[in-house]
Amino acid sequence: MRSAIIKEGPERAANRSLLKATGVTDSEMKKPFIAVVNSWNEIVPGHIHLDKLAEAVKAGIRNAGGVPFEFHTIGVCDGLAMGHEGMKYSLPSREVIEDTIELMVRAHQFDGMVLIPTCDKIVPGHLMAAGRLDIPAIVVTGGPMLPGYVDDKYTDLISVFEGVGAYSAGKLSEAELKRLENLSCAGAGSCAGMFTANTMACMTEALGLSLPGCATAHAVDAKKVRIAKESGERIVALVKENLTPRKIVTQKSFENAIMVDMAVGGSTNTTLHLPALAHEFGLELPLKTFDELSRTTPHLISLRPGGPNFMLHFDRAGGVEAVVQRLASKLHLDQLTVNGKTIGENLDELEIVNPKLNAEIITTLENPIHAEGGIAVLKGSLAPDGSVVKQAAVDPKMRVHTGPAKVYDCEEDAMKSILAGDVKPGDIVVIRYEGPKGGPGMREMLAATAAIGGMGLLESVALITDGRFSGGTRGPCIGHVSPEASEGGPIGLVKDGDLIEINIPERILNLKVTEEELEKRKAAFVPPKKEVTGYLARYQRSVHSANTGGIVD
């Protein structure tokens, strides 16, 4: 056991003495030491229940003959950080989480670890630590929140964000907005649609790093507690088998995950997190792989924000495994998972308990919702290194569009203008200097896109940014434009009124300005300098472009 280095032999008497100070007995010294890495806190709805899941995990570890030791990581709520400087700290927190897990696990020589994250950057941070450390590990994602129910329809956090835009446009009363505010977020769990947190939970299961059914089992469901307990039991077996993440996750595993991503219409943030995760596993995952697999993998289930169904419906219809079942002819079924079985072997044991709902909301390869997957990668004179759009959530009328640019150098300026009614049908809103370095921190533009949506403009207005979007964003919203403005990317050269061409079927994003004019602008271009201090200053110096996953040196 790895932990032998801190607990065996006369020379380790002092180490054992410290362990005994925590209550460890001599008999426990002979058992595997398991880290329970918990991102519980009291301000993030997706994390307020993780203390209970950690207790279940620890019970499972003890049942199987291990000794659990719990420690905590940070966790940022993107919803609470949205629309102000706090969002600059969200993406950077991913690497902080990964680094702190490495520090704790390496310093204390744990034999294995159970990782308990829920929300947007916390799940990838935990996964990246699993790839970097490569000790036996299993992930228990915290599970979705139940949807709200207002005015005889299901609602979620995005309903509230869009309600703000509707209120500003005079389409919603203050009392109606208050009702949405009070009733749309029903309690513990990640926001109730196929937004970033739930997309990453699905990616975790598709990669084989969590037990079957974990991704969609809801935060308040007893099934989640049982999965947590079973995960605690399983980690002890993983230690004995020396089955580590790099023996489970391969290039083919990432291809499987991307195909599932395309089928469920997942968040564009996967194009940041999966390449960064692959990097920690010693693999490469370029943007072109996403687009190649999108062209051959159909979109099979219409989930919020691009459709009517919530994670609750998806879970009842069979969850990730039900989609894997539909995609079986395309997937690498020989890939291993943390339960020791291959994806194909897990499928053999799959029971669909609600066959009617399964058939109603998860379509087939022969009759999909869309022939292509949920995400498209666009390139052109405005994005030479690429950009991404959730094409599954774009109105057909806006899949091909050319319009005049309305340019803003930060999200706050754009929001004021949108809410003031300055943005008109046909316009293309450009928000720049919001990339990984330029922000710094690559903020999400959900407040802006939700305001546009709430004002009824998503069928006529597009938004382009070198920042990124929430998984809750819908409409013709193109993000991760690379190179970013602060690095001299063409998005920094756009002026008000310039025509921009968007062609999603052809994967084109062009600035309709002559080469001669662009060269003139480039010669005079000086990106604004932002004074940043503390962690953001270190992050700005070391972060890489969005098209490579925004990894940090």
From Swiss-Prot:
Name of the molecule in the record: Dihydroxy-acid dehydratase 1
Gene3D superfamilies, per database record: IlvD/EDD C-terminal domain-like (3.50.30.80)
Chemical reaction(s) catalysed: (2R)-2,3-dihydroxy-3-methylbutanoate = 3-methyl-2-oxobutanoate + H2O; (2R,3R)-2,3-dihydroxy-3-methylpentanoate = (S)-3-methyl-2-oxopentanoate + H2O
Record text on cofactor binding: Binds 1 [2Fe-2S] cluster per subunit. This cluster acts as a Lewis acid cofactor.
Keywords for the protein's UniProt record, in alphabetical order: 2Fe-2S, Amino-acid biosynthesis, Branched-chain amino acid biosynthesis, Iron, Iron-sulfur, Lyase, Magnesium, Metal-binding
PROSITE patterns with a match to the protein in the record: ILVD_EDD_1, ILVD_EDD_2
InterPro entries: Dihydro-acid_dehy_C (IPR042096), DihydroxyA_deHydtase (IPR004404), DiOHA_6PGluconate_deHydtase_CS (IPR020558), ILV_EDD_C (IPR056740), ILV_EDD_N (IPR000581), IlvD/EDD_N (IPR037237)
Family classification: Belongs to the IlvD/Edd family.
Annotated residues for binding of [2Fe-2S] cluster: 119, 191
Subunit structure: Homodimer.
Organism in which the protein naturally occurs: Methanosarcina acetivorans (strain ATCC 35395 / DSM 2834 / JCM 12185 / C2A)
Name of the gene this protein is made from: ilvD1
Active-site residue numbers: 470
Function per UniProt: Functions in the biosynthesis of branched-chain amino acids. Catalyzes the dehydration of (2R,3R)-2,3-dihydroxy-3-methylpentanoate (2,3-dihydroxy-3-methylvalerate) into 2-oxo-3-methylpentanoate (2-oxo-3-methylvalerate) and of (2R)-2,3-dihydroxy-3-methylbutanoate (2,3-dihydroxyisovalerate) into 2-oxo-3-methylbutanoate (2-oxoisovalerate), the penultimate precursor to L-isoleucine and L-valine, respectively.
Enzyme Commission number(s) from the entry: 4.2.1.9
An example Gene Ontology CC term for this record: cytosol
Gene Ontology MF terms: 2 iron, 2 sulfur cluster binding; dihydroxy-acid dehydratase activity; hydro-lyase activity; magnesium ion binding
Amino-acid biosynthesis listed as a keyword: yes
Pfam families: ILV_EDD_C (PF24877), ILVD_EDD_N (PF00920)
Enzyme class: lyase
N6-carboxylysine found at: 121
Listed pathway(s): Amino-acid biosynthesis; L-isoleucine biosynthesis; L-isoleucine from 2-oxobutanoate: step 3/4; Amino-acid biosynthesis; L-valine biosynthesis; L-valine from pyruvate: step 3/4
Cofactor: [2Fe-2S] cluster; Mg(2+)
Any one GO BP annotation for this protein: isoleucine biosynthetic process
